[in-house]
Amino acid sequence: MPSDHPDFRSKSARLRCQPPRTNNCGTFKQPPSVAATSRPKPGNPFLQPPTKGTPPPKKKKKNHTEGCHTHEANPEPNTKHTETEPPIISHCPPPHPGPTATPNLLPCPNPTSSFCQNTRDSPSLPPNVQTWSIFPKHPSKDVTAQVKSQSVSHRAPITYQPPRPTTTSNPRISQSYHMKSISSYLSFAHMNITHTTEQHAENQPHWKTILDIAPFVSITFPAIMCLIFDEDSFEESPFLRFITLLLPFSYSAVQYALLYTNWKSHNKPEPILHTTLYYTLSLLLLAFTIISILSIIPFSLNEWDHAASFFYPIVLPSFTVPPAYLLSSSYFLVPRQIRLTDTVISILISVCSIVNVLLVFKEFNYYPYSAIISSISVLLQLLSEKHCLFKQSPPSTASSRAAVLILTLILAVLVYTFLGYGAIYILDDHFHLLGKMKSILPSEPHQ
């Protein structure tokens, strides 16, 4: 048998002639130790190159995974050579787990990489078949996860399919979402309500202060205007007369209107006596409101002489303001429960109003005293409400307190009857209303 027969060649020569093995990473080169021992040496017939009859090894095409080198030694035992061969050293990444994947396994972000593809050319290794289960990141109770299985061969790469978006059909998720939105809205609404309440609480003392000083200002302001301007100024300027009378008449109109609405808001009494008192007081309050509004224009149009320049700014406010102030602050006007609820200073104000009526029939030199008395009595009333200077009256309806209430109502009726008559007289003097009404009405034929 010739020496160049394949059976007589060395182990290294046979390894050099055999085609290289491939694994998951493609073609691999022999280690330098094996390559060094496989070089032919002169004079050694066993290390000669193969004969011409032996076909050379075919070169395989480089795979995209070339670069991952695995040094593999001869798996068969070498009885002729005593040199040790190195173990298998793999630089490739570990293979991807197969069917034993974890439940929440996410697919490979780059399907074309060497880590995701598993191409095998060796027939000794079976093709790796992987089954991926795709689950949503946020699973819901009602919506089940869809499981997708794909068979991966050594030729076809894995195609990545993203998971479908989950819906909010879960009642717990939707309920929590709505509860969050409602809580945020309620927090904003609570903030808005708190801000409104705090603003109302801050503005309420200011309005209360304005309403408390309104009767005092309504009496003193026209008196100050009378002291500042002379008789000629009031006679020449109707606007100045209007400004002087606007504040006291407006205060009385507003107070009587509020009393009328509060009185009408209560239930109507059933007995005949209470029903009569109920409608009588309602009619009086409504008449006082209308007369206070309509009296501003006629008294402003009238020409003020020397006596009128003291009467309108000083006497009229002391007539109109105290009754309205007493009825709105000192009396509890409720059907079946009408009583005096304030201090004894209310009686003093009623007495001062009667004194003012008596002073009207005297000379105009006493006019300033009526304004001074009314202003002082109202000021004492305001101080008693704020600092409790006088002892409050009991809630029971005594005969004396009922008499004071009746006296106040009679005084108001007399004052506003006088104001109504004066307003009609002034309008008739300017526009001759009575003459026009007589001409319109049919006259009786003369016999």
Swiss-Prot record:
Compositional bias segments (type: Basic and acidic residues): 1-10, 64-84
Ranges that cross the membrane: none
Source superkingdom: Eukaryota
Annotated spans, Disordered: 1-103, 147-173
Bias-annotated ranges (Pro residues): 92-103
Family indicated by similarity: Belongs to the UPF0328 family.
Record-given protein name: UPF0328 protein ECU10_1870
Organism annotation: Encephalitozoon cuniculi (strain GB-M1) (Microsporidian parasite)
